[in-house]
Amino acid sequence: MATELLKGVILTLNEARHIQACVESLAWTDGVVVLDSCSTDGTQDLARATGAEVLEHRFENYAQQRNVALDTVDAEWILFVDADERATPALAAEVRELIRACEETGWWVPRHNHIFGHLMRATGWYPDYQLRLLRRSAARYDSTRHVHEVVDLDGEAGYLESPLIHYNYETLQQFVDKQRRYLDYDVGILQASGTAPHLYTPYTQAVRHFWWRFVTLRGWRDTVWGALLSTLMAYYEMVKYLRVRQALRSDRKPETTS
């Protein structure tokens, strides 16, 4: 049986800039564990200096890192928080009250995303629910999903009202770099599903995605930031389908003989 009711867990890799503020925001838990992927920027020392327990495990994928935490952290409940996120006093009070006598085995946590310095109120970045508060004995991450992790939960999940604060993309370059890291994975998913885009598909998908974010998800509420992010994500959709189409065309080219 776990000796503590709730611990916060932070996955890190070179997060010296964020780690201390993140750990401090979890001071209300029964302990904070930093699961570090062999940082070289002093993240581990800074985490210890702020009162966190530090464990090290070489990074394989996000799902595996979270499963390592579920296997090793001694607590009945785990709240996963990223280094660029902060728990608020309101979230602390809500979580503490709920987990003492709830039937749910997991809780979806909303996030307030700050992107390019702007608090997003729509455009798909709010409420941006994440399944982060987990009863450790009832949760496992799908190890086949290397990004965009999926939790296999034994039981029902509820929804919290109080958000995490997420200091998301600060610059356009940071945004572009992260989307590039996701691109190969997302293209692979489309290819595995047998998706065969037509010539026009990348462009119609881009238009649909922009409409979905800016109109359906009310991105207009975020004014110029909603328009910018809707455009960037629409461009990402276009490139994704262009990549799939390009790969299909390459596969269909007949081999030449000399």
For each predicted feature, which ranges?
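N-proximal low-complexity "stem/linker" segments adjacent to membrane-targeting elements
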Residues: M1-S25, K253-P254
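Acidic helix N-cap motif at the loop->helix transition within catalytic regions
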Residues: R17-Q20, D41-T50, A90-L91
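A conserved acidic beta->alpha catalytic loop
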Residues: S25, D36-L46, D82
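Short, structured coil segments at secondary-structure junctions
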Residues: W28, A49-G51, Y129, L153
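Conserved beta-strand segments of alpha/beta enzyme cores
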Residues: G31, E53, E156-G158
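Short acidic donor-binding/metal-coordinating loop in glycosyltransferase active sites
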Residues: S37, H57-F59, A75, D82-E85, ...
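Glycine-rich, basic loop-to-helix element that forms the pyrophosphate-binding segment
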Residues: R58-V73
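Catalytic-site signature of metal-activated, phosphate-bearing donor transferases
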Residues: N67-L70, W77, T88-D251, T257-S258
